[in-house]
Regions:
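Conserved glycosyltransferase catalytic-site signature
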Residues: 90-95, 123, 172-176, 197-208
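Acidic ATP/Mg2+-coordinating residue in the GHKL
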Residues: 37-38
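Conserved catalytic core of nucleotide-sugar-dependent glycosyltransferases
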Residues: 77, 108, 117-192
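Active-site-proximal specificity loops/subdomain of glycosyltransferases
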Residues: 41-106
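C-terminal catalytic/acceptor-binding lobe
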Residues: 182-250
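Short, acidic, metal-binding catalytic loop of nucleotide-sugar glycosyltransferases
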Residues: 4-7, 11-29
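Phosphate/oxyanion-binding active-site loops and adjacent basic polyanion-contact surfaces
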Residues: 1-12, 44, 85-94, 118, ...
Length: 250
């Protein structure tokens, strides 16, 4: 029942801490945290900036301009129904994140919604796992940091991999938080942009179509908690000490 900004602040704190821990294992890695912002009020921006100033990791807030992308976002969904202003804001953030990834030549990109609180070793585990599994399958892939409860609501076959300190299983669905490579972004840029220009049902449908062709893995147990939907099938993962993670990121 906390205000939405509280989820965001704890998400940022947890990601920063996890990135700082990851740099101990990956000495030469260059990590940059970029926040796309769509008209947050100054009070909330000040709170975010205060957290960003506490780390030596490179950080940046990029504000989405007024009416940016509005001409490319369809005002109706695939059913012909008008979409809400809040949904348009979400889609603007998706398009801004993809735009940033398009113009940057980093090897890996982690697209993160603003309500995922991470365990300390989340980034370390994802980096080691990506490196290991991509070599094992001789290809790029997608990693989702959350072991969503809803993924157990149907009976699906999974392939099991061993990452760094966790098992990972193949999944066919995620929300819009995932890690992948620049190669994959370039390969599927049109589908990724469709998530921001047309409201599908589910919103992540284009991702799910990509996962029909590419590996997407999620960890067992989870590396993150989807805080906004904590009481739903998209919230607290199995065998996850949510209160500990919540309290550690005050």
């Amino acid at each position: 029942d906390s205000p939405k900004i509280e989820y965001t602040l704890r998400t940022i704190k947890s990601v920063i801490r996890s990135c700082e821990i990851a740099k101990r294992s990956f000495k030469d890695i260059n990590i940059k945290i970029i926040i796309s912002d769509d008209n947050s009020n100054q009070e909330n921006l000040d709170k975010i900036n205060q957290i960003l100033q506490s780390t030596n990791i490179e950080t940046q807030i990029i504000s989405i301009k007024d009416n940016e992308f509005n001409d490319t976002i369809s005002s109706v969904d695939t059913n012909g129904d008008k979409i809400s202003d809040n949904m348009i804001s979400n889609m603007r953030n998706i398009l801004k994140s993809i735009q940033i990834a398009e113009s940057d030549n980093s090897d890996l990109f982690y697209f993160l919604e603003d309500d995922y609180i991470h365990v300390d070793d989340a980034i370390t585990e994802m980096l080691f796992t990506y490196e290991k599994i991509s070599s094992q399958i001789n290809d790029e892939l997608f990693l989702c940091p959350a072991d969503y409860p809803y993924l157990y609501s149907s009976i699906e076959s999974s392939k099991i991999f061993f990452g760094n300190m966790r098992h990972w299983r193949t999944v066919n669905e995620t929300l819009i938080t995932f890690l992948t490579s620049k190669i994959m972004i370039t390969k599927y840029i049109d589908k990724l942009k469709l998530m921001g220009t047309k409201r599908h049902h589910p919103m992540e449908l284009m991702l799910h179509e990509i996962y029909e062709k590419e590996y997407c893995l999620s960890p067992i147990p989870s590396l993150t908690m989807h805080a906004t939907n904590i009481n739903s099938m998209y919230g607290v993962p199995p065998n996850f000490d949510w209160k500990k993670i919540w309290d550690e990121n005050k």
